Amino acid sequence: MKRAPNHPAELARRIGIASEDLATLEMALTHPSFVYENPQAPPEHNQRLEFLGDAVLGLVIGEQLFVRYPTWTEGELSRRRAAVVCEANLADGARRLQLGAWLKLGRGEEASGGREKPSILADALEAVIGAIFLSGGIEAARRFIVDLFGDALANAQNLVSGDNKTAFQEWVQRTGPADIRYCIVDESGPDHDKRFVAAVMVNGTVIADGQGRTKKEAEQQAAGRAMREWAGRKG
């Protein structure tokens, strides 16, 4: 993925950040590696905003789960919140916003495919949420988060933190036995920087695919996407 050529004002308009807060958005898109490799640049990177955005995200998702699922215990709410805001879901949301194209990365991260790394994308999304909160307050942040995580919130009862494959299997087999299989459909990159694409099939039909730096990561992402797709089909 190449860096977006345009000023982040375009992204700011899309996500609801005021024009006078563009500097905050730029900070949210600045990875620490860029600052370390460019000492002449402004010293701020996105880690503090990531901290703030993580707190805002946790609050909003917790609030939504509390209201939508009134019979859940504290433990159930905590587990499902962790599942909704897991790295895979955060990275998926960042990809839908095409945040990777807007990131400022150091040369090393750029060369190693940093614009596609789930951890970097997840951190950037949290930082952007922090920027939205500072620009527009909790209501603006809530609108953004609920819109971006709407599918995950609607399907929260079927999510299990850390193991999408198990959760998907349990969800599918509620309606009876099913043959669930995962296969690697694409593999690219040098040995030190592999990328895998996995597909998940139910009874021979491809439901979703996912990608990752390991086969396991790709399969987990495929399962997470498949849960949302399967829930939509059965809903």
From Swiss-Prot:
Positions of region (Disordered): 211-235
Domain RNase III: 8-137
Subcellular location per the Swiss-Prot or TrEMBL entry: Cytoplasm
One Gene Ontology term from the biological process aspect of the record: tRNA processing
Keyword DNA-binding listed: no
Essential cofactor(s): Mg(2+)
Superkingdom assignment: Bacteria
UniProt key word Ligase: no
Annotated residues for binding of Mg(2+): E50, D123, E126
Predominant location category: cytoplasm
Residues annotated as catalytic: D54, E126
Record note on quaternary structure: Homodimer.
Family per record: Belongs to the ribonuclease III family.
PANTHER family on file: RIBONUCLEASE 3 (PTHR11207:SF0), RIBONUCLEASE III (PTHR11207)
Name by which UniProt lists this protein: Ribonuclease 3
Species this chain originates from: Heliobacterium modesticaldum (strain ATCC 51547 / Ice1)
Gene designation: rnc
